[in-house]
Amino acid sequence: MSNHKDYRCYGLRLLTVTAVFLALIAGFNGFFDPYQVIGTPTIKGLNQVKREKDIQVRLFKAVAVNKIEAKSLFLGSSRTEFGLDTHHPGLSDLQPGYNLAITGGNMYEVRRYFDHAIATQPEVKEIILSLDFFMFNQAKKNTPDFREERLGTRNLFVGDLFEVLLSKPAFISSLRTLKNSFSRPNNPGFFYEDGRRNPDSTIEQVYFNQGVIPRFRMVLRDFLVRPDLYGTYQLSVDYLNDLNAVITTSQQRGIRLHLFISPSHALQWEAIRVAGLWSEFEAWKRALVNLSPIWDFSGYNSMTTEAIADPMQYYIESSHYRKELGDLVLNRILDYRPETVPSDFGILLTPTNLETHLEQIRRDRELWAQENPKWVEFVEALKP
């Protein structure tokens, strides 16, 4: 009997210690709230610099958009995250807005975040959706941090709650949040409050403060090597159907939906050519236009051929553009101060003008290549 009581007491003590330990961990992580999903008040010097949100983009954005009554949204990949500012004056009557683009997402993920937004944000009136070639690659699978369960609801998913409060990664992120908040209290981190990415933090932490040319080289090589980007490519019918679902639902809900192809730098289009995917690139545009008119900012126009120098006014590297260029994109799409936008930047594609436009891009590419053989060779040298 004595041994039984001893075991019972030991078990109770162990449970008590474990419960206290977990409560302390949960309290610690809840206070520092490294992914900014709990809603803990921020205290300067302790927990206000949330740089760790970058490792839980899909989680924190699903929660963040629920904290406002959004009237306008941006959707797409990290190109949209960097380039589009919700405070653009052309959207002044559609505030607040939120940049709900998700890093490296495929079209299915983008569709599901669209579904999430319209399920929880009944006031949304306008959506601007950026489309990228790689988003429609059959090999581009859902990212590991994508979870269906957190979408379509304003409540925090139980699995996410555990991840935020009790997981080892969250504890490490909380420690880093304390360190960053204490050592760099005025640093905004990777994201602004409206969901737009901070290019300065990205250049520092992701590109290790490298100059423009090393950044171009790093990104282009990545696109050429990775099978889910340009390494291999098969246009996904399923992803086209996901886009069509977004278009159809927007029409049914009376939401103004603007579609556009990102204005990456000319070297990004050279990477598509070097990868042997130019015909697939054009086939993708044809498939898009069959679904809806779409603004095309790609190609070799006066903006995408910006001279490569350090610093650059409009580009971070070949794939991602800055707010300065994003403002011109929005000027064109929203017909806001159209006189500020070069005439060759942004063409509304329809079945009527598509083939002429594709032919014009081929001619523009030949002229650009003749004038820039150094950069043609630069991209070709990166092919694995």
Feature names for model-found ranges:
Residues 32-54:
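Alpha-helical transmembrane signal-anchor/signal-peptide segments
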Residues 274-275, 279:
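Small-residue-rich helix-loop
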Residues 47-74:
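Short extracytoplasmic
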Residues 12-33:
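Hydrophobic membrane-insertion alpha-helices, especially the h-region
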